Design a protein with these regions (language model features):
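Hydrophobic alpha-helical transmembrane segments
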Residues: 1-174, 178, 186-316
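Glycine-rich phosphate/dinucleotide-binding loop and adjoining beta-alpha-beta core of small-molecule
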Residues: 183
Length: 316
């Protein structure tokens, strides 16, 4: 049943994406994280050790609770009727994927860039990146959008797809809980240096294998879409560690190589300047059309991952 749920979820995401009117599990995960963080901080000592333990408790409770709750709902639905169980799994699998939403948001940036309306492009890209965007040039906006497509191809598409192929919607949503937790508390700043450490480490572990699979699939997608697959492979091998996270540069490096552009580098986050290494070679200047090229490669690698997964499941 899992294979059919994954296939159905993939189709649902490709057609509908994430409609704004439809409640999304990630929203409730975010609310749960905020409540748990507030409660843990209030009850534990305000010391590095106390914050470490608070973060560990959060990193245990949220994924375990997510898996338990979603498993109970799926089993309950299947007990009422197998088709209802399949429908619930299919619906949640679709919500765990973010391919359509990623393309929609990145294309919003693309459309503003080609008008050209730089202030509107900055606003559009600010919805999908964490860096400060107020002073970005058109090149900086384009680079930010391409980087986001490449990175989220892993943690927004390939990783949840892999986990749902292994354990259905419950495991995919558990992964989303880990990823959401990291995005909310996994910062190395004063507020979360200790409290967010366990969440960040758990996210690194959960993404370790998927990010590398995603990078290899990106190289294959580069070949299938007429981009530079040889350069994608070479730059991935060279620059895949050019990031503080062991996973974030995996698909970014493959994407930079495929497009023959340079990504990453210094950026401002929350008003603070961060000096980060570059990824890829500036063989040519980056251009708005690279956003569309990245989107196409992301979709092709998603289809490759789906096909391989369904073959392993015996569906194809």
């Amino acid at each position: 049943m899992i294979g059919y749920a994954v296939l159905g979820g993939f189709v649902l995401d490709a057609i509908f994406g994430d409609p704004a009117w439809l409640p999304h599990p990630v929203v409730y995960m975010g609310k749960a994280i905020s409540v748990l963080e507030k409660g843990l901080r209030a009850r534990l000592p305000k010391t590095p050790e106390g914050e470490l333990w608070g973060g560990r408790i959060l990193a245990l409770c949220l994924p375990v609770g997510t898996f338990a709750l979603t498993s109970l709902v799926c089993m309950g639905a299947a007990a009422l009727h197998p088709l209802l169980g399949l429908a619930v799994q299919m619906f949640w699998c679709g919500q765990a994927l973010a391919a359509k939403g990623l393309v929609q948001e990145s294309m919003n940036v693309y459309r503003e860039l080609i008008k050209p309306d730089l202030p509107a492009a900055r606003t559009a890209v600010s919805r999908i990146v964490g860096r400060d965007t107020q002073a970005l040039t058109a090149e900086g906006v384009t680079k930010a959008a391409v980087e986001t497509v490449a990175e989220n191809a892993s943690d927004g598409v390939i990783a949840p797809l892999l986990y749902m192929l292994l354990g259905g919607a419950p495991l995919a949503l558990t992964y989303k809980a880990i990823n959401t937790m990291d995005s909310m508390v996994g910062y190395k700043n004063t507020q979360y240096l200790y409290f967010g450490r366990a969440a960040a480490k758990l996210d690194d572990i959960a993404n370790f294998l998927p990010s590398r699979i995603a990078a290899l699939l990106w190289v294959a997608a580069a070949a299938l879409t007429g981009n530079d697959a040889r350069s994608a492979w070479r730059i991935w091998r060279r620059d895949r560690r050019n990031h503080a996270s062991p996973n974030s540069a995996q698909t970014e490096s493959a994407c930079a190589g495929a497009l023959n552009v340079q990504l990453a580098g210094p950026a401002y986050y929350f008003g603070e300047y961060y000096k980060k290494p570059t990824i890829g070679d500036a063989v040519r200047p980056i251009e708005p059309e690279d956003i569309r090229r990245a989107d196409r490669m992301m979709y092709v690698e998603s289809l490759l991952a789906l096909a391989l997964g369904l073959l392993m499941r015996g569906i194809l």
